[in-house]
Design a protein with these regions (language model features):
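Short, hydrophobic/aromatic-rich segments at coil-to-beta transitions
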Residues: 61-68, 87-95
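Hydrophobic ligand-binding cavity/cleft-lining segments
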Residues: 2-64, 146
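Beta-strand/loop substructures that line and gate deep hydrophobic ligand-binding cavities in soluble
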Residues: 3-7, 19, 83-86, 92-154
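Short, cysteine-centered beta-strand-loop-beta hairpins and adjacent loop/turn segments enriched
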Residues: 74-78, 127-128
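Short beta-alpha junctions and helix-cap segments that line functional grooves
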Residues: 55, 80-82
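Generic structural detector for well-ordered beta-strands
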Residues: 29-33, 60, 70, 83-85, ...
Length: 154
């Protein structure tokens, strides 16, 4: 009797899903002094993300919705692929990785005025970089400076 109970418990444990890692999430926003079309257009140049997302070393287009990337989160290079799962021109871009280090995110664009745009970045990840929220704030600050410098030159 005890043998069959133990065997059933073992079988049930083997069929049970593995414990899922914790999901870390962060959200930040910034107001960029530029029209929404210009702001969206800059972010949608996916290969240029390393210009303001400093942990990214390289992004290369595979096809219209898939990109390979190399990033340097904590002193070591990691590679992966991400997929653009939603793109609403002028409004929103959402993505998720399809590699081992799960990460998903969405960046949204809202006009504040004809010459100002609010950019909101939300990220969810099983990877726990130190101060995820602070990193998003840094990336958005870099993006703001990049866009506003280009806007000032025009």
């Amino acid at each position: 009797m005890h043998g069959s109970l133990f065997e059933n418990s073992t079988e049930a444990m083997n069929r049970a899903p593995a414990v899922q890692p914790a999901i870390n999430a962060a959200q930040q926003f910034v107001v960029v002094r530029a029209p929404i079309a210009r702001v969206y257009e800059q972010w949608s140049r996916i290969e240029d993300l390393p210009r303001f997302v400093t942990s990214l070393r390289q992004v290369r287009r595979i096809d219209d919705t898939h990109f390979s990337y190399v990033w340097h989160p904590n002193g070591e290079d990691k590679q992966g692929i991400f997929h653009i799962v939603l793109q609403i021109p002028g409004r929103r871009i959402a993505w998720r990785t399809i590699s081992n280090d799960f990460m998903s995110g969405v960046v949204s664009f809202e006009p504040c005025s004809e010459q100002e745009t609010e950019v909101t970045l939300k990220v969810r990840s099983i990877f726990d970089p130190p101060n995820l929220s602070r990193r998003l704030e840094e990336y958005l600050g870099n993006f703001k400076r990049l866009v506003e410098r280009a806007e000032d030159r025009e």
